[in-house]
Amino acid sequence: MNKNNPLKKLKALLIILLFCVSSNAFSLETLKKISIHDGDTIRAFLKGKEVKIRLAEIDTPELKQDFGVESKKCLEKFLYGKDKKISFKFREKDKYGRLVGWLYSGNLDVNFEMVKTGCAWAYERYAETQKLFFAQSFAQRNRLGLWKNEKAIPPWVWRQEN
């Protein structure tokens, strides 16, 4: 058998490349000095630099919209408190220059919890997995948070109208 098989070398290289890319994509970075703008946007220090972060795959009511202030308070509940370690998993940079990704409070997936508790919508336009839609169905069935209002308007609709 030929040890210099180019197909084997290519396969090995692809496996190594995949490992490097995926391990980097899933690395968590610790955030410091967090301030909350609204239910899906925060400012924080990441590696000593102040950044604006947008929570991936979810959308929350705007502050002037019904349930907007409550949504912000939900996020505060998940992020503020003694001994909470807040981490961030980067996905991309958006057109406004914000870092987009997932927040974790310890092991808790904050983006998921925001939807599950009825504090956010699964953002149909950007959601990549079904888990947020399952969480949203749970919140709707149990009339949690914004789902107490049967006529709740998704933020992307509200923004177009206002």
Where does each model-flagged region fall?
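Small beta-barrel nucleic-acid-binding modules, primarily SNase/OB-fold domains
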Residues: 2-162
